A protein has these predicted regions:
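Proteostasis/folding factors centered on peptidyl-prolyl cis-trans isomerases
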Residues: 1-32, 84-114
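Peptidyl-prolyl cis-trans isomerase
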Residues: 38, 42-83, 114
Length: 114
């Protein structure tokens, strides 16, 4: 069993997110959860078609502060992330990209990198 994983992600915040302010723009988000879901589904299609662009898309689109690192969250262990995020990441193989992952922070797509 793996104790630690490394992942990158793209976060789309919405009005119901626990802190509905984009770390990339510094402005409050204005979209509802349905719109965020549609946005992340489009992003998932893009990154699954061209995984090499994950970091670039994260820099351009993610609402998480990790946008400046191309979405890289570094290594983390169990209990360090919100449970749905942790479960999805640990279920992926290195290089795999998740589907939609919904947490209190917003809606994510995750790529396991280590």
């Amino acid at each position: 069993m793996t104790d630690r994983v490394r992942a990158s992600h793209i976060l789309c915040k919405h009005l119901g997110s626990r802190n509905p302010v984009s770390r990339r723009t510094g402005r409050p988000v204005t979209i509802d959860k349905e719109s965020a879901l549609r946005e992340i589904q489009g992003i998932i299609t893009q990154v699954k078609n061209d995984p090499g662009k994950f970091a670039l898309i994260a820099q351009e689109r993610s609402d998480c502060g990790s946008f400046s690192r191309g979405g890289d969250l570094g290594f983390f262990g169990r209990g360090e992330m919100q449970k749905p995020f942790e479960t999805a990441t640990f279920a992926l193989k290195v290089g795999d990209i998740s589907g939609v992952v919904d947490t209190d922070s917003g809606i994510h797509v995750i790529m396991r990198t280590g």
